Amino acid sequence: MGIRFIYGRAGTGKTYFCLREIKEKINDGNSHPLILLVPEQFTFEAEKYLLETVEKDRKMRAQVLSFKTLANRVFTEVGGLTRQHVNSCGRSMVIYKIMEDLKENLKVYYKASRQQGFIKKISEVITEFKRFEVTPEKLMDTAESIQKEGLREKLRELSLIYGKFDELLHQKYIDEEDALTLLAEKLEYSEQFKGAEFWIDGFTGFTPKQYKVLEKLLKKAARVSVTLTMDTSKDSIDNTDLFYTTKKTEDKLLKICYENNISYEKPVDLNEGVPKRFEKNEEMAFLEKHLFSYPYKIYSKDTKNISLFKAVNVYSEVEETAREIIRLVRDENLRYSDIVVTARDLKRYHKLIKTIFSHYGIPHFIDLKLDIKNNPIIVYITSLFEIYLKNWSYESVFRHLKTGFTNLNKEDISFLENYVLANGIKGGKWKEEWKYSFRNRLDKLFDDQDEKEALEKVNTIKNGISEPLNKFYKDFSNANTVREACEILYNFLVERDIPQRIENLIREFKENKEFEIANQYSQIWDIVVDVLDQMVEVMGEEKINIDLFSKILDIGFEAYQIGSIPPALDEVLVTSVDRMKSHNAKALFVIGANDGIFPASSFEEGILTDEDRQILTSYEVELDRDTKAKVFEEQFLVYTALTSTSKFLRISYPIADHEGRSLRPSIIISRFKRIFPQITQFSNVIEMDTDEENLHRVSSPDPTFNEMIKSFKEWDIKDKINSLWLDVYNWYSNKEVWRKRIEKVLEGFNYSNQVRVIPSAKIKRLYKDEINFSVSRLEKYAACPFAYFVQYGLKAKERKIYSFDPPDLGIFMHNVLNEVSKALEKEDKTWEDLDREYCDEVVNIVVDNMLKGVSEHILKSSPRYEYLSKRLTRVLSNAVWVISEHIKRSSFIPSGHEVAFGENQMYPPIKIILSNGEEINLIGRIDRVDVFEKGEESYIRIIDYKSGNKELKLEDVFYGLELQLLIYLDAILESADKENTDIKPAGIFYFRIDDPIVKADKDITDEELQKEILKKLRLDGLVLKDAEIIKEMDKSINGTSYIIPASINKDGTIGKKTKGATKEQFELLRKHVKNMIKDLAEQMINGNISITPYRKGKETACKYCPYSSVCKFETNFEGNKYMFIKEQKEEEIWNMLQKEVNKDGDKVD
């Protein structure tokens, strides 16, 4: 027995040396076993290399083993497999259950145990304790000695959890760490490795338990050779040295040999001369030797094999990597399998790599294990319990249904979802028969379908979901043990054909050549079964409720990750830096070389902080290295990664991340620039239009096609193009498969994002020959004809959600104010009679009655909405008080509320005769009409209630965006003209319903507060420019009015702050509005549905438009232009109105 070290820096051929020796031993005819011991993650690669090197080994003496497979071999021979193996899933489940049982004793950790990922951290620290042979008793003893209270409590609780874990495990189970302890014990009785020769390769260091196994192997084996990535042995080195960790490993192995009287053979030194890997690459040899040299050594020659790339963002970084891979394979005779792409943080890149490499046709394998929690099958199972635990919430139900593993098709799910969302269905409502009207909540979405049939359909779908689930929940609640609960869940999944559905999906994925997804799905069912098996194993006979079962099930799934085996021989390997080993790479791409990422500058501390570890070390409790040591070890990781290629090295870094946030280059970049002053540096931050750059953009057919189209677009703008792209165009044109695609794309160059005029006959059928139009619809058409067409022609509607939206708020407020006016009439009161107390009382009564009248009123559906109801009551009470104050201070009195004009209404509709002789009717409802009688003359003002800020602007009237108030006014005046009644306009106003916040620098009286409220809620609109009328409208006016937008000077004339119009100007506005209505109606009926939204400053019709995804309006599209509305002075608008009315003459009938 003896030990031999094989020294060699990166690339010196240590693995090759081991394989060559194994081959020689086989050829010499030696009969003893020849074992290559490597880390678990490298066994596949090592077996491949062994097969390639050995070629013939009929007696199968040469084997590749990891510590795990070594343990299995020994246990098979001498026993040790009788105890049930518990994997990381079972460990996590046991730990969670233990923490539930110990919750009364866990002040520090119990609450944290509910957090996702915390159980994994506890499992990791217990694993660390086991690896470093720290027992629960030692933890408790140390805790008693420690002065720091926080750490003392931590250790006490960890000791309790760890102790209970060990107690449960030793009854009949064994985990991976205990397997190493058992292996060390059983090796003594094993005969199969007696006289064997071991080559241990690929390790940087070992855990204490692995050292114990190695101690036993050293006693058994004829010889143990250990490769060490380092310089030739030195007596001592600093902890900042590149090879410090490897040196520590050497020292520990020497100590074991010394203590056990094991001979030390002459080491093999492979560090002489140029490393084997870099024999033909002077630059890489220099890099390997001087990467971390201090002071810097400079390579003064041209650098051709090492390059840097600065990318504008992560997408372009990966795309450039793909192009360079294509070039290497095409021009440098490399195979895809010669190429490795690596990143320190692969999770940041793997989706992009998958997308872009697939687009470029690059076969690749991503060596990354993925969490399974978002796999549809796992979601189907976890949401099964979530539905019950969250009382049939919308989110949990439809998370379950949308997995694709129910019997519902997408149309049924969508149909059901619309109904559930519109009616706020959750909880116990899923057990009832649904009778909520489709028409009421979904705005007549089912005009062509009988209401009864729709309800029958939605209830059938609902029952198909709820009945089997409720049966499952009932069966589950009757389960007496975890074993029975697992059986019920398993049977439920089998009854729903989940295993068969998975098989069908796998087959479909393979047929579509989606092998990676097929591979993932092929593992999922086994994982589900294994999780249930582990639950039965570790707590099978225990009683458990559904809540705890669900949590433990989630913990079990969290412990699993899905990995893949490379399905092809010739493909690019994409791996993370910390999983890299020599892959005989000829080309290496290091991506994401940014500051703090490569090398990593920080690590999560875990359960025990660095400070905790330092304190424990002082109490002789040795654990794994702290985060500071890990930072020092990063340079070794960087070294091994950068020196793993023999021919070509490209290091790239983006200057911005996925979200556009700036990133700094890694310190490695500046180090490379200093070592290699002649290094080639590329960048796409500024695109260069050179022949070389254009040629570089030619790679695979798909991406090159996109580059060609991009060049053609630039040609259209710059009026020049590189002739290369004309040659590329000819290549595609001569290929049948590409010709049609080219034609389609080139057609798109002339694309105009506009719509054709719809023939009048079709538009009439679409609008169903409607002749009645509301004012709001006309304003909608004026704002954007296309949005109007989509809403009223195509009947497209936003999905109705059970919520209290602004339109609902407006309707509610209008209804309350209307009911208040009815209550006043019933009690024979006038608005002048109201005081603040009565306003509060009457509004409370009205709101209560409205809520009682509708059993399912949304304002009673939750505490949040009940609070909103109280707030609205306060706002409306304030509005009623302000209205009463307005009326008290005015000679104008309300003559009507909710005054309708239309067929069979108080006032007839406004009739407009179009150019073709057709007639349309304008209909509507006026919130309030106030009247002032002056002799035989009557003056009216129109009041429209608004729940938000609304300001009347003349330019909006001119362009048709604000027609409402003037049409309301015209409906009254036109009717009066026909009846020869002398009624004159006094004003048109918006009244804002609000309870404003009043800010004051000092204490103010109630009277001052009321004035401030009135000022904030002043009417907005146009008042008749008649001083007498203004004074009648605000009898208390003194200067600027508190209630109307007007002011009176001291001499009795109208002030400048007055927002008004003369009698002639009101007439002008009426004529203009009628002309505008006629124009809009004719455009509408003539089929104009152009995409022309208005724009006024920063405000556009598109801002809150729900149809932007339909029109795809973009100003860079030909034909897409705004209808600009310029803010102008009043005088300019009046002149424009005058010219427009004079031009049209007697246009309005």
From Swiss-Prot:
Q: Which domain of life is it from?
A: Bacteria
Cofactor(s) the record lists? Mg(2+); [4Fe-4S] cluster
Write the Enzyme Commission number(s) for this entry: 3.1.-.-
What the record notes about the co-factor is: Binds 1 [4Fe-4S] cluster.
Q: Which residues bind ATP?
A: G8, R9, A10, G11, T12, G13, K14, T15
InterPro entries per UniProt: ADDB_N, DNA_helicase_suAddB, P-loop_NTPase, PDDEXK-like_dom_sf, PDDEXK_AddAB-type
Per UniProt, the keywords (alphabetical) are: 4Fe-4S, ATP-binding, DNA damage, DNA repair, DNA-binding, Exonuclease, Helicase, Hydrolase, Iron, Iron-sulfur, Metal-binding, Nuclease, Nucleotide-binding
**A GO molecular-function descriptor:** metal ion binding
Name the residues that bind [4Fe-4S] cluster. Answer: C784, C1102, C1105, C1111
GO biological process, alphabetically ordered: double-strand break repair via homologous recombination
The family line of this record is: Belongs to the helicase family. AddB/RexB type 1 subfamily.
Self-association and partners: Heterodimer of AddA and AddB.
Q: State the remark under miscellaneous.
A: Despite having conserved helicase domains, this subunit does not have helicase activity.
Q: Which HAMAP family match?
A: AddB_type1 (MF_01452)
Role of this protein: The heterodimer acts as both an ATP-dependent DNA helicase and an ATP-dependent, dual-direction single-stranded exonuclease. Recognizes the chi site generating a DNA molecule suitable for the initiation of homologous recombination. The AddB subunit has 5' -> 3' nuclease activity but not helicase activity.
Please give the name of this protein.
ATP-dependent helicase/deoxyribonuclease subunit B
Name its species: Thermoanaerobacter pseudethanolicus (strain ATCC 33223 / 39E) (Clostridium thermohydrosulfuricum)
What gene makes this protein?
addB
